[in-house]
Amino acid sequence: KNKPGFDLKEGDKIVSLVSLSMTPLKIEKILSIHKDIDRVDIIGKAILFESALYCKMPEDMSEPLALAALDVAGAPAQARKLPHEGDSVLILGANGKSAVLCGYEAMKKVGPKGKVVGVVRKASQVADLMELGVYTDVIVADCTKPVDVMEAALGVNDGKEYDISICCVNIESCEMSAILPVRDDGLVYFFSMATSFTKAALGAEGIGKDVTMIVGNGYTKNHAEITLNVLRENPKLRKLFDEKYC
């Protein structure tokens, strides 16, 4: 893993892979605020500690594009690591940027005998997501209503529970929608920062689900390169990110 200063020279552009909530910042001047893409341009200083993670700004894509992808780099790297060939994977919040990156990596891992199913709230989102080719199916359900999600999800999986679910919904009370459709000994990955440990742990206990739950660790080995490679490999996803997040 990279450590600050070991392979850098003055003037290099880098992207911190540590959350801003964990990064000491001295903001000297705010230049502009981009509300539509959650970005603020500033003049200032940031402190990266010896254990901090970063990567050099890639030369083959724009800065806004790289930043948009690296913001959620942990998710697609986990989606590459967790599934196996033939698995069924359920991705909640399928329209978000972390979810489409996860879908792409999961599709590669599960292969032609597996399934990657996305869950969205609006029917109007389905056609565009299917066009991306990162899901085998996209279903419409409210992720705060776990029974609705389970019924819709099992309906496109021949009535079978899922091996893995990935929760990318950034709103509260979606824990049970990620847990309920998953089989015993399956895996639930909560990437969303809105996840409540209490709701997830007690909810799984309350319905008698013996599942492994991972709470969204943002770091996975090589996660930055894995995520940037998704945009290099998939022109449709790159176009989506360029249009929506840059």
Give the ranges of each region predicted by the language model.
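Mid-domain Rossmann-like dinucleotide-binding core that forms the NAD(H)/NADP(H) cofactor-binding site
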Residues: 61-140
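Short amphipathic alpha-helix with an adjacent loop that forms part of the alpha/beta core around
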Residues: 146-160
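N-terminal Rossmann-like NAD(P) cofactor-binding module of classical short-chain dehydrogenase/reductase
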Residues: 15, 163-166
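NAD(P)H dinucleotide-binding glycine-rich loop of Rossmann-like/cofactor-binding domains
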Residues: 15-86
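Glycine-rich beta-strand-centered segment in the early N-terminal region that forms part
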Residues: 1-20
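Short, well-ordered loop/turn sites that connect or cap secondary structure elements
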Residues: 6-10, 83, 182
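Glycine-rich phosphate-binding loop and adjacent beta-alpha segment
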Residues: 169-234
